[in-house]
Amino acid sequence: MPKTITKEYVVYDLEDLKKDNELCDRIYQKFWIDSPDNINGWSDENIDSFKKFAETLNMSLDFSLSNAEYQDRGCYVKLIPDYRLDNKDYKEMLKDYKGNGYCFCDDLKTFTLKLLDKKEYKVLCEWATNDFVLEIQNKMFQLWFTDNEYYFSKQSFLEMVECNEYEFLENGRLA
């Protein structure tokens, strides 16, 4: 005669995680940080924002970016400008720029327009264009890793637990 065996599991939800910091840290580490499948869900939109922005400014984009909180040696963003364009051209290109609607688009537009208002970028000779482009590259790099850093933060983890109503086993797996 077959037997039925049942096992009870203790399940933890958001309220449990908020009450027990040690439990929260353990599950956060196992489920969020250590999972090789956990990457920033917005990374594709971020890359699309960079591509659309570069395309709008008639620049070529080359990049290698990790999906981690911090860059490694192989990470870079490289923009290659059209040196025939000047300050007025770039401002005109950005005038009605919306990008793909993601926040990086507006951040890059605002940052670049502020750069173009600076004295050193009023006239874009080759060296000034190189400096101008370098500042945009650095901004893209900073936006990428700031977004990843936030995504992997404990605060972001707790927000995901709340909006998805996740419940966990003590070993850090979803219940």
Task: Report the location of each language-model feature.
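Alpha-helical propensity feature that highlights long, continuous alpha-helices across diverse contexts
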Residues: 2-175
